[in-house]
């Protein structure tokens, strides 16, 4: 035994197989491979990498999470697991599809599902009141640490449900999972923020509440200001937002703020400049000259009281349209918090974000597009002004990461047609792409709602990893390739001929 409490004396040893080539890295219980060997090597020799204690633990954790979910939904709430098609129809309004050519219907294509969205809604019309699935999904999009071209969702849908019922069901589920696998006690109930509150206070719809820095609107402080940049912004209908960074004045130099790391991060979010002030001894301020000189004593006191500043604090400003100012400071809030290591990594922050806008304006295409997806139900109070409507949507946020998102759904064909028209899908296009769904809605569809969790991302967070590749047995690289099998690869000419594809040119 590993403990040494039992010793086995062997009389005969039979070698079942031999290692006939040198190993690219050692596999030991000390598990230092991840630090010493690049990920490309570990993915190329994944069968060895999976022997490591860390990977064994991660994949067994994944198994336990799925097992807990299945047992809870089936045993406690009588959900039915139903598989939906993998070969389906390409539809607009989403990421790029993976397409599969049909041999028996030349010139036509299946699409691999980005989610089981439409099929699970049709299951609600079919009389299955509680559906779930551990679903494989596919999206042809640019990759990053928490995205893969193929990924796994916990997918759920419930008929005759309310938003409150959906939130409670999912809070109970997550409390059960987190407690069982990590002895983590999540609050009851989960805190909630509306989309507008989250954006206004934290600059993001995925706020990390493990630290309490908040954005403040300081526009009133600078009304009538002689600082031209601020005055012009307010005159044109913009806002001035501020973020107070405790202790930031002693950490970041003026160079950091004018052209260094902090300024660079702000510019990535669209900032054209980064006005700042530092709170020095006796409440004196230092910073941008014209900004300082524009602050009369009573305005300075008003600003410092509003931000509750202390000696050594740093005040950062963003200006312009409210959405852009929020975005700039929201990005800086997270960047600086990581830089200063103020986030309590042992804490667990979970909340719901609700009341999302139904639509966002796509300035490139000059049209509205669905913020979530076009099957989300609008708030009944906003039916008279759908372009500005709030959605009956809800996202679950854990430590600043969206782990699940859902909504109540549209279940009447006339409402669905109106939503399609707003996002630029004509009645003819709607019939061609979604006629089968609209037909179902006309057969007595019940009210329904659902949610989907990114299972890979959820397990990644529970495992304390920074990449979902560390909780997937055989993941793709950031170039959407399998380092082990070399997929995707060229195929035989006859295979292309069978599909009526032209031969590839050399």
Each predicted region: which residue ranges?
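Class II aminoacyl-tRNA synthetase catalytic cores and aaRS-like
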Residues: 1-506
């Amino acid at each position: 035994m590993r403990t040494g409490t039992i010793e086995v004396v062997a009389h005969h040893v039979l070698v079942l197989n031999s290692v006939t080539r040198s190993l690219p890295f050692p596999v030991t219980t000390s598990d230092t491979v991840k630090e010493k060997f690049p990920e490309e090597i570990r993915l190329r020799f994944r069968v060895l990498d999976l022997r490591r204690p860390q990977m064994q633990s991660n994949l067994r954790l994944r198994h336990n999470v799925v097992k807990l979910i299945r047992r809870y939904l089936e045993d406690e709430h009588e959900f039915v697991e139903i598989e939906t098609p993998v070969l389906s129809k390409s539809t607009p309004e989403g990421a790029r599809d993976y397409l599969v050519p049909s041999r028996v219907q030349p010139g036509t294509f299946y699409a691999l599902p980005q989610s089981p969205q439409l099929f699970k809604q049709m299951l609600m019309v079919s009389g299955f009141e509680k559906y779930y699935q551990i679903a494989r999904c596919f999206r042809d999009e640019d990759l990053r640490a928490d995205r893969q071209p193929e990924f796994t969702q916990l997918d759920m849908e419930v008929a005759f449900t309310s938003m409150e019922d959906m939130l409670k069901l999912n809070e109970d589920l997550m409390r059960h999972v987190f407690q069982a696998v990590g002895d983590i006690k999540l609050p009851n109930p989960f805190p909630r923020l509306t989309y507008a509150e989250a954006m206004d206070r934290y600059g993001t719809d995925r706020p990390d509440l493990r630290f309490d820095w908040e954005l403040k609107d300081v526009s009133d402080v600078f009304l009538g200001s002689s600082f031209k940049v601020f005055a012009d912004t307010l005159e044109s209908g913009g806002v001035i937002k501020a973020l107070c960074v405790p202790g930031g004045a002693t950490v970041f130099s003026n160079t950091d703020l004018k052209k260094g790391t902090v300024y660079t991060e702000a510019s990535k979010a669209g900032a054209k400049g980064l006005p700042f002030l530092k709170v020095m001894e006796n409440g004196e301020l230092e910073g941008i000259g014209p900004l300082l000189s524009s602050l009369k004593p009573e305005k300075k006191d008003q600003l410092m009281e509003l931000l509750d500043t202390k000696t050594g604090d740093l005040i950062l400003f963003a200006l312009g349209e409210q959405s852009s100012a929020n975005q700039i400071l929201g990005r800086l809030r997270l960047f600086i918090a990581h830089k200063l290591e103020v986030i309590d990594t042992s804490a667990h922050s979970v909340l719901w974000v609700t009341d999302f806008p139904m639509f966002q304006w796509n300035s490139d295409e000059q049209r509205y597009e669905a913020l979530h997806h076009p099957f989300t139900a609008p708030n009944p109070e906003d039916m008279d002004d759908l372009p500005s409507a709030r959605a009956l949507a809800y996202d679950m946020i854990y430590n600043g990461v969206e782990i699940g998102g859902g909504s109540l759904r549209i279940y009447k064909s006339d409402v669905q047609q109106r939503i399609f028209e707003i996002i630029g899908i004509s009645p003819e296009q709607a019939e061609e792409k979604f006629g089968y769904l609209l037909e179902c809605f006309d057969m007595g569809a019940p009210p329904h709602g659902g949610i989907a969790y990114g299972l890979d991302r959820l397990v990644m967070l529970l495992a304390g990893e920074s990449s979902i590749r560390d909780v997937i047995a055989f993941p793709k690289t950031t170039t959407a390739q399998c380092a082990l099998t070399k997929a995707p690869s060229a195929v035989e000419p006859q295979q292309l001929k069978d599909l009526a594809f032209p031969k590839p040119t050399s």
